[in-house]
């Protein structure tokens, strides 16, 4: 019997003492080094979701358009006309913190493999990114490195990066979030799944060679970031986008041949994960001979083979007798392809090396029957939240027509608006997306920054572009400050905003993929945030009929402060949502089209709050209060009206009110069109700063040409939602003017003055 490992050796694999005892009991013996490593990666939070799985079970996962839900490499929805969309979001947070370029690049590569492993051709990439403030040199290095990595991989692989979101906040200093989402188009009914089947069927290793890069990446991603994390740079993988481009084509050709029974990419935990998951999902076993695996380094031992996360690798189960056909396809594309094993009846993963058995573990022990922790939920909100909820608007200085006093200094509303437009979270992300190739494949309908959601034309390979009018819209959304202050309501708001952004381009929301980025679940506060956010997501998705098709959980996003205490990020449940566009020729952006168009607000300002707002954080340097709460009946009514107006051709511009409230939304529409506007604010008992900069759900600003306004207003009169005409689009080089009910000009600025800080905010900070 193998000698027991020391506690330090066990802990080094991320395994708790009680988990090691469980392993010994399951095997009936002590594991060897390779087996211990296999358990370490497969029982990590990154792979088995041992703290989050009970919470995820509450998500709605079924719907009339859902073809594949959670459990496969990606979700799949039915677009109609024989077309299907595969989509998924995943994180690469920890690798991007220690090696920003490669961490972000391989995050893109990994999510693309999830898509084409299903048999779908990748058609778009989106990203949800979070960084610390750019006045810190390390944060600037991480930010520029991540953007470089995303652009390098996406541009080289030939898939357009079409949208996403970027936030900056001290909560992410040293622990960035890099969440990558991808979409893929399927033209056949055949969906490639991961479950192995067919006793005796050959198992093929295809793609790149195996090296020592990415060793233990899954375990690394399941631990807090510390001062020693830079020593874990070998746990960051190195990607080759040109090789991945060949892998995409080879895999799609192989799937089309009908010779592939099942497929699984080698992502987290590499060979260990792909063999265990394929075997467990199929209820069979897999034997694999490591001596057959193509390598790029000499002297590798089983532990290294099994835990390597070298990129651009796949595992196939093939139809018997058709191995050579598949091998020839991959060789033609300049890729490795070998028969490395077979499917067996005994449901175990058996690994051979140099004529002996290197590892032998029941497949379900690695991939299905893993530890699950049911943690106790706090019976009341933690102290930080209760203290934050004590804040009231009356704690601020009075808001007068001339402005507000902040730290002894009078600021006009003009100055406040310019300050918000200069906030990197609100400001233009042009510095970022100008580095992305967003037009490759020639199907991008709206360029990044042009609308509230990305829109891509759905074009089958053999179709003429002019014949294709169906599109797909996609977005990633989460205001993490809301979730920090109230995880339940903040998560609902994230789902609602994602659907609202799709509705702003005229798309019907279909389904969700989620990326749960949180701190340690072993901290009662962290688990409270996670549990309530999951409850909020479930509620939001049920209300809006957008089932969850899968996603990713990234926990232990924490750094240590100067006293060695863990500092978690803001809880950040990113919602990736996709929608169907009936006719891409009717899609609208956020910029006003023409002078003289009417400007309308769908929804009401009555639900505005300064709690958790960008105004409160940026202008008053305060994070407190209750965030906005979603009225889903109102939310659905507002979105329905917006979609209907776009479909009828009445609405020619739409933009939701998010960070910065009504004033920032209108300023962004003015900047996008370079047209001014005169806005008449309604009479209100609200504070002026709440009316101007307060935030709430369920508000969309739209523009309508004069000839369509009677029909539009007649339609709205028959709907059960509040709305009002705010004003009229002005002229080029005009001013954006806000006038209150007493005819006072609260804000009056040339569009050029709005544009300058908004357009240059990020670039200026990078030069500092």
Curated annotation (Swiss-Prot):
Keywords: ATP-binding, Cytoplasm, Ligase, Magnesium, Metal-binding, Nucleotide-binding, Purine biosynthesis. Gene3D superfamilies: PurM-like C-terminal domain, PurM-like, N-terminal domain. NCBIfam families: FGAM_synth_II (TIGR01736), PRK01213.1 (NF002290). Its EC number is 6.3.5.3. Belongs to the FGAMS family. Mg(2+) 1 binds at residues 90, 552. Mg(2+) 2 binds at residues 114, 265. Its main location: cytoplasm. PANTHER family: PHOSPHORIBOSYLFORMYLGLYCINAMIDINE SYNTHASE SUBUNIT PURL. Monomer. Part of the FGAM synthase complex composed of 1 PurL, 1 PurQ and 2 PurS subunits. Substrate binds at residues 91-94, 113, 237, 309-311, 554. The active site is at residues 46, 92. The lineage of its organism: Bacteria, Bacillati, Cyanobacteriota, Cyanophyceae, Synechococcales. This is Phosphoribosylformylglycinamidine synthase subunit PurL.
